[in-house]
């Protein structure tokens, strides 16, 4: 099937979906209606671009016809030639756009994410930088109209973050933040440095798609659930009723503890969201490691410890090492203006996939 047959098939399916979504039997079946609505929405951009492309092809035919029928009218012929030139340029642009729209979609792109940030090498300074990254993602989420909820956080004595787990919810969150997983390195003079020397520290970021229970079923026999009293500052028990929850996935020894909420059930629900995402991510990473050819076509190696980005404060510079992008905009990027970085990563990924497709 060539690209035009693929596009026609997508348009035919889109029109079929439109009819199905107006069928009373489908409307009354909430689950099916939502599935079909999601499928229709996922193909809308492709169909719109394809229809515009077909109009451009018609414009080329019309312009060529006008040139033939100009009958010696120099002005009319000149106008038709300009229209033909413009339409041919548009045709090339649409063909590139349509190739990208037909690339295989990441099934997780529309999902919410669970975001984990940890201070790594560098002690207090690494944990302070982890806090800076948390604020950066919070501000970016706000600019995108997403909901950002801190689910669990552990702080050090100087205001830094040892570890934080957050849920980011909204439209296409994973598609934009999936490239953030990896080691983020910072170069700056710590507030505790009296000699003015630049130190290098690292924080790690992990982005996982939220996995619904119906998508990934964990056998209850593989889980150990412990209930205990939530503790406050200094380790004292703050609740008379045991509300804190610890869940361990026995086959992988992945563990989640949750005590942020006031009730045991809410802590359990949040812990299950996180452990489902971590376990699914664990096995997805194993599968990815086994697919060397596929890994070559993704940004970076896929190694979670891979250094992906450096934030150099003295030079106000951010460098993304995977795509060779350098921006002298560290202050604005840490203020949540991540669009330029995200767009460059998305474009690079699309380019790599197109090259794979054309081999």
Curated annotation (Swiss-Prot):
PROSITE patterns with a match to the protein in the record: RF_PROK_I (PS00745)
Keyword Protein biosynthesis attached: yes
MF GO annotations: translation release factor activity, codon specific
Chief location bin: cytoplasm
GO CC field: cytoplasm
Location relative to the cell: Cytoplasm
Entry-annotated residues carrying N5-methylglutamine: 236
Superkingdom classification of source: Bacteria
Compositionally biased tracts (Basic and acidic residues): 293-307
SUPFAM superfamilies for this protein: Release factor (SSF75620)
Pfam families given in the database record: PCRF, RF-1
Keywords: Cytoplasm, Methylation, Protein biosynthesis
Gene3D superfamilies assigned: 3.30.160.20, 3.30.70.1660, 6.10.140.1950
Region of interest (Disordered), ranges: 288-307
PTM annotation, UniProt: Methylated by PrmC. Methylation increases the termination efficiency of RF1.
Function field: Peptide chain release factor 1 directs the termination of translation in response to the peptide chain termination codons UAG and UAA.
Family membership: Belongs to the prokaryotic/mitochondrial release factor family.
NCBIfam families xrefs: prfA, PRK00591.1
UniProt name for this protein: Peptide chain release factor 1
Originating species: Streptococcus gordonii (strain Challis / ATCC 35105 / BCRC 15272 / CH1 / DL1 / V288)
């Amino acid at each position: 099937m060539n690209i035009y047959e693929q596009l026609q098939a997508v348009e035919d399916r889109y029109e079929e979906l439109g009819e199905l979504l107006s069928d009373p039997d489908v409307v009354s079946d909430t689950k099916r209606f939502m599935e079909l609505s999601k499928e229709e929405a996922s193909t809308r951009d492709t169909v719109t671009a394809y229809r515009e492309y077909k109009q451009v092809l018609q414009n080329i035919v019309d312009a060529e016809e006008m040139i033939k029928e100009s009958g010696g009218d120099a002005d009319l012929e000149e106008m038709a030639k300009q229209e033909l030139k413009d339409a041919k340029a548009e045709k090339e642009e649409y063909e590139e756009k349509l190739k990208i729209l037909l690339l295989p979609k990441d099934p997780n792109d529309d999902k919410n994410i669970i975001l984990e940030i940890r201070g790594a090498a560098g002690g207090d300074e690494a944990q302070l930088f982890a806090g800076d990254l948390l604020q950066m993602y919070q501000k970016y989420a706000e600019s995108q109209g997403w909901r950002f909820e801190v689910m669990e956080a552990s702080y050090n004595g100087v205001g830094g973050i040892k570890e934080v787990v957050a849920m980011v919810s909204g439209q296409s969150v994973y598609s934009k933040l999936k490239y953030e997983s990896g080691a983020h390195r910072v170069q700056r003079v710590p507030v505790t440095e009296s000699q003015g020397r630049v130190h290098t520290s690292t924080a790690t970021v992990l982005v996982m798609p939220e996995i619904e229970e119906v998508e990934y079923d964990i056998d209850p026999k593989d889980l150990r659930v412990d209930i205990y009293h939530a503790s406050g500052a200094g380790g004292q028990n703050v609740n008379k009723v045991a509300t804190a929850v610890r869940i361990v996935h026995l086959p992988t020894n992945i563990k989640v503890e949750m005590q942020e909420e006031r009730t045991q059930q809410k802590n359990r629900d949040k812990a299950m969201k996180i452990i489902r995402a971590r376990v699914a991510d664990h096995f997805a990473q194993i599968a990815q490691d086994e697919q060397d050819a596929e890994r070559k076509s993704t940004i970076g190696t896929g190694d979670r410890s891979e250094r992906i980005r450096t934030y150099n404060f003295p030079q106000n510079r951010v460098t993304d090492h995977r795509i060779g992008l350098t921006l002298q905009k560290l202050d604005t990027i840490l203020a949540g203006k991540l669009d330029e970085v995200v767009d460059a990563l998305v474009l690079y990924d699309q380019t790599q996939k197109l090259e794979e497709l054309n081999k």
